[in-house]
Amino acid sequence: MTLEKDESRQDDALEACNAEAVARKAGEELNVFDKGRMEGPDAESTTHGTVRAVCVSKRKGTRKTVVDGPVTIEAHHGVAEDAHAGDWHRQVSLLAWESIEKARARGLDVKEGDFAENITTEGINLMALPLGTQLKIGDDVLLELSQQGKVCHKKCAIFYLAGDCIFPREGIFFVALTGGKVKAGDSIDVVKLGDGTCEYTPQEALDELANTPR
């Protein structure tokens, strides 16, 4: 091999490495709202999904029951007749079906509602959404993301019934800005990407999450 050809190959390799680095840097700088997760046909989106199930319980610390037909979400209160509804920042809880499937793959016998989520979602990457993000569900309901995960001070019935509780790590909470009906099959759309803050979330809740392993 001549010296000239060897230098040419080195230049080509260097150019390829530089191009790869530039492309990687550009990818890192893309906003997650625009990029989503588009690695394949089954990849989760950060902008759109669907309601897989709506679940309700009369008591806290228990599994929720999947409800057939539409369920009412009341503005600034939460899911009608659900134990977690009220005047606080965790009015409506969401958990991705993809998270439940991961638990099932580990051998847990779990389904929609078993981790006490109000709405089981499908197709949307909930964990990529920052605080303050607003979701429109169906025609009327508007929710704002107020908390990511939670702290379990003691293992509740859900942990013992399911063998683990993934909600503290992968569940998220919302306040209901507007009310309406929600049912399985409804669309979920990000209408506003949050800036990482939510006026409804008390500082002590954020401090507890930051200082407690889950």
Predicted regions and their residues:
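Electropositive, beta-rich accessory/interaction domains or terminal extensions
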Residues: 2-149, 181, 195-214
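Conserved ATP-binding/catalytic segment of the ANL
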Residues: 174, 181-184
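A short, polar/proline- and glycine-enriched secondary-structure boundary/capping micro-motif
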Residues: 154-158, 200-201
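Short beta-strand-turn/beta-hairpin segments enriched in glycine/proline and small hydrophobics
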Residues: 156-166
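Short, structured beta-strand/loop micro-motifs enriched in basic residues and often containing a Trp
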Residues: 114-124, 164-177
